[in-house]
Amino acid sequence: HRIIYVFLISCLAFSISLGKFPMSISLIGLFLNWIIELDFKRKWKKIKERRYFPLLLAGLFLVELFWLPLSEDLLIGLNVLRIKLPLLLLPIILGSKDNFQKTEWKAIISSFFVGLLISTFWVYLVSIDILPTKKTSGTIRDASIFMSHLRYSALLSLAFILVLFLAIKRWANNIFCLFFLFLLGFLIIKFSTLKAILGLFTSLIVGFLFLF
């Protein structure tokens, strides 16, 4: 089950930049694998060892659930809950499992970058009108077809931090790191908004605080 677990986490990392549907499939697979594994006593022990922090994170979803009756549009509220369901499942699933080993981290991070490379290539083709888009705002935001422009910018900022992390930890080839840094820099400039730039600098500051 450990191999399946790491595979599904890698699938989730791969699909983060490719839209809600593949992410949902990966999340459902993770949840089913977690249930089929059983051994809930050991999982609860692991959560207690982490001072119930996974449950605290999962509680953020319950806050959304609490506010649902106060929503002006119940259908919109239910859709928001569906989108934020990972806030409930992922902390419990990840928090009840053993930490990832170095090789597992490499597989997960590599999957994230492969997915990001595919999505950025797709987005770039949309931005130069080779591929169509369903959005009609007439701005560069239309190129972000897999998610909102703001979320895509945040994802690019996260990828920038990950590349720096890989370079510092020497988990990846220097040529790979330079390639992705130039690619991400180009994309951030091309799709830049004030929020994207602020998000990048905020991510850099937070990332360096954790790295050093």
Regions found by a protein language model. Give the residues of each.
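Juxtamembrane membrane-water interface segments that cap and precede transmembrane helices
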Residues: 5-10, 133-145
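Short, conserved clusters of charged catalytic residues that mark active-site
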Residues: 9, 89, 181
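Alpha-helical transmembrane segments of multi-pass inner-membrane proteins
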Residues: 104-138, 147-212
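Aromatic-anchored transmembrane helix interface
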Residues: 54-60, 74-96, 107, 111-116, ...
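Membrane-embedded alpha-helical segments of multi-pass membrane proteins
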Residues: 20-40, 81-93, 151-160, 198-205
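Transmembrane signal-anchor hairpin modules in multi-pass inner-membrane enzymes, especially those
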Residues: 1-69, 75-79, 96-106, 110, ...
